[in-house]
C-alpha cells in the first residue's frame, strides 16, 4: 500500500472512530436539554413579562409595587453597596449560618428522640404528652421569650430555627422506626444482635425514607421560622432586610429580600428531593 493510500485509510478510520463520540456527546446534550424544567421556566417568564407589562401600562403603580426592572436594580445596588451594614451576600450568609446550625441541631436531636420514642415504650409514655403539647406552639411565639432569655443573639435565632425544625424530624423518625417490619428486627435479635444494635443497623436504615422526608420538612420549617425571627430580633439576614426596607418605605428592597428567600428555599428543596430520590430509588419515581 502506498503512503497516500495509507494516509487516506487512516483518515477514514479517524473519521469513523470519531462518529460514535460525536453521537454520544449529542445524545448527552439532548438528554440534559430534555431534563430542563421548561414548563416552569415558561411560567416564570410569563409572570415576569405580565408584571413588567402591567407596570409599564400604569395598571400597577411602580411607586407602591416596583416593576421587575426596579427590583433588579435594587438587587444589583444591594450586591454592590452595603445595606444596613452588610451587602446582600453578607445578609444571605448570616441567614444561612443560623439556618444550618439550627437545622443540624434539630436533625441530631430529632433522630435521637424519635428513635427513642419508637423503641422504648417507657420513654414514649413519659415524653409524648410534653412533646404533643410543645409541638403545637408556633415557632414565632417563642421569639419574645428567646430574646428575653438569650438576648438578641445567634443563640436565640438558632433556637427559633431548632424549635421550628425538630417536630417533623421526631414524628417521621418515630413513625418510620415504629413501622419497620417486625420480622426484620426479630431475625436480627435471633442472630444475637442486642436492642441498640438492632435499632442502629436494622430499624433506622429501614426507616430511611421517613427520616429523609422529616429532614426535608424540617429544612423548610426551619427556614420559615428563621425569616420570621429575623423580622423582629436580628441585626442582619434576609428577614432583617425586609423589616428595615419596610421602615424606609422601600418596596423594591423588600422584594429583593423576598426573592432570595424564595430562591434559597426552592433550590434547597430541589437538592433534598433529588437526594431522597437517589437514596431511596426502590420506592419508585413518585418522590
Q: Could you tell me what each predicted segment is?
A:
Residues 132-168, 175-176:
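Generic hydrophobic transmembrane alpha-helix motif, especially the helices
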Residues 148, 177, 224-261, 280-287:
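Glycine-rich helix-loop "coupling/hinge" segments at transmembrane-helix boundaries
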Amino acid at each position: 500500500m502506498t503512503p497516500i493510500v495509507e494516509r487516506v485509510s487512516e483518515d477514514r478510520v479517524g473519521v469513523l472512530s470519531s462518529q460514535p463520540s460525536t453521537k454520544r456527546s449529542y445524545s448527552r446534550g439532548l438528554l440534559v436539554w430534555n431534563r430542563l424544567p421548561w414548563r416552569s421556566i415558561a411560567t416564570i417568564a410569563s409572570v415576569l413579562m405580565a408584571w413588567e407589562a402591567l407596570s409599564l401600562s400604569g395598571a400597577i403603580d411602580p411607586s407602591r409595587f416596583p416593576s421587575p426592572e426596579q427590583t433588579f436594580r435594587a438587587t444589583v445596588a444591594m450586591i454592590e453597596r452595603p445595606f444596613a451594614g452588610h451587602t446582600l451576600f453578607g445578609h444571605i450568609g448570616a441567614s444561612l449560618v443560623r439556618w444550618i446550625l439550627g437545622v443540624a441541631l434539630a436533625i441530631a436531636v430529632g433522630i435521637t428522640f424519635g428513635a427513642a420514642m419508637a423503641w422504648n415504650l417507657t420513654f414514649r409514655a413519659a415524653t409524648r404528652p410534653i412533646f404533643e403539647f410543645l409541638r403545637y406552639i408556633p415557632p414565632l411565639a417563642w421569639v419574645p421569650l428567646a430574646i428575653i432569655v438569650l438576648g438578641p443573639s445567634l443563640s436565640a435565632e438558632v433556637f427559633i430555627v431548632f424549635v421550628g425544625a425538630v417536630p417533623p424530624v421526631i414524628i417521621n423518625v418515630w413513625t418510620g422506626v415504629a413501622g419497620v417490619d417486625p420480622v426484620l428486627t426479630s431475625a436480627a435479635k435471633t442472630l444475637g444482635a442486642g436492642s441498640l444494635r438492632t435499632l442502629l443497623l436494622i430499624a433506622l436504615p429501614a426507616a430511611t425514607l421517613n427520616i429523609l422526608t422529616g429532614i426535608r420538612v424540617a429544612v423548610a420549617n426551619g427556614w420559615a421560622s428563621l425569616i420570621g425571627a429575623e423580622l423582629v430580633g436580628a441585626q442582619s439576614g434576609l428577614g432583617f432586610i425586609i423589616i428595615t426596607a419596610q421602615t424606609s418605605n422601600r418596596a423594591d428592597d423588600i422584594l429583593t429580600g423576598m426573592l432570595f428567600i424564595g430562591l434559597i428555599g426552592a433550590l434547597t428543596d430541589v437538592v433534598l428531593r433529588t437526594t431522597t430520590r437517589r437514596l431511596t430509588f426502590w420506592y419508585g419515581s413518585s418522590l
